[in-house]
Amino acid sequence: MENMTLFYGMLAGYIIAIALLGYLGYRHTRSAEDFMIAGGNVHPFLMALAYGSTFISTSAIVGFGGAAGVYGLSLLWLTVFTILVGVFIAFVFYGRKTRELAHGLGIKTFPEMLGTYFDSSFIRRFSAGLLTVAMPIYAAAVMIGGARFIEESFHISYQLALYGFASIIIVYVFFGGLRGVIYTDAFQSIIMFFGMIIVLGLTYWQLGGVTAAHESLGAMHHLVPEGLRSLGHAGWTSMPVFGTEIWWYVVSTLVLGVGIGVLAQPQLAVRYMTVKSSREIYRAMLVGGIFILCMTGVAFTVGALSNVYFHKTSGMISLSASEIGGAGANVDKIIPLFITQAMPEWVLMLFLLTLLSAAMSTLSGQFHMISTSLAYDLNPAAGENDRQTLIWTRMGTIMGFLLTLIFAFSLPSSIIALATALFFGLCAAVFLPVYTAALYWPKVTKSGAIWSMVGSTMLYLYIVLFVHEKEAALFGICEKLFGVKTL
């Protein structure tokens, strides 16, 4: 970027606004209840924006947008699922019941809700332990997305981008708790909404309009690399061939894994507990639906259309364009490259703030969940002293932050969408059955809930590590133990 003075001015204004909102959260955080569920009296508009911005992160924009650059508009089915399942079903069938159950039991966290309902300390601690281990991987994917864009925009090292980006987030989560998180999430979601609308409009303008852009994308089907075509890729405007490897990956991992897994996301379920009545959840539904439609629909459409831009300007498809400096193709660089090359500088600045907002809003919710799992649900002394619990949860934020940094430096390239889908799939497999039972099936026993969670965890890990080819190859455990990529 050439006009750095303008950008630094925008960034300074952004950071000042975040700092003020974080301070506002800090001023209103006087108890563990304030830190964990924002006092339970948040306005539904703020809750909807916080829910949407926590759900939609850089993994949705950069990771899944990049995946759309590879697999095309088939990812728009994920948009359908995120609205139908992630908003309508989530708010109507899960949000109201969750809020009523949480307030009736007087609980503050998702693991505590399951453990208290089934009268099982094992369920509470098993849930918290699983979140403590698995959520930093998802958080690392989000952090990687933000750092990658900063790396491309400022031409600085990935390590420096990661440290700087992460340091800003940890400060306001540490001091502001969930109140600070919700205040900043609402502000960031507004930036995200308008930033994505502008990017979509300029993308169509760059490519000659809506009709011309999609016709050009449809006409590029013959440019699909043979390696992808042999696995079922049928072009960027078509679904992959039914039953092929790519079809299974797109449908089972990306679309269904995330589209259904959203129902059992602990950091989202906590949002239902922050409003003062069940009626407020219904009032929040429209705002949440519009926001998520804009975020996912734009990201996946722009990701697919980036192929048209790169083909017109360099004769390459997006996947080939992401091979920078002799390195292999990196799906996570498709969206940053497209924005950097195709958009005016002021849009690049705005989009950088959009990505910062997306990443920070999601990471703040993730760090908050990790901290409460570590310091409250896994701590036998938690809850005995309100002031002490607040201190412990803030210490848990630091520990979650360090775990996430470790994963952010160790995960391989092109990992953002996959790591996100893995976490969502894990939550769907382990938490969704017992979560649904707690809300709708009172006859479920404690032992049944325990074995459901343990059995689902073991089965999910078996499928991921030994059966599903893409994930098994990533972890490499099956090949090390048995000499083959999958069983």
Model-found features: residue ranges?
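Membrane-embedded helix-loop-helix hairpins and adjacent transmembrane boundary segments
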Residues: 1-487
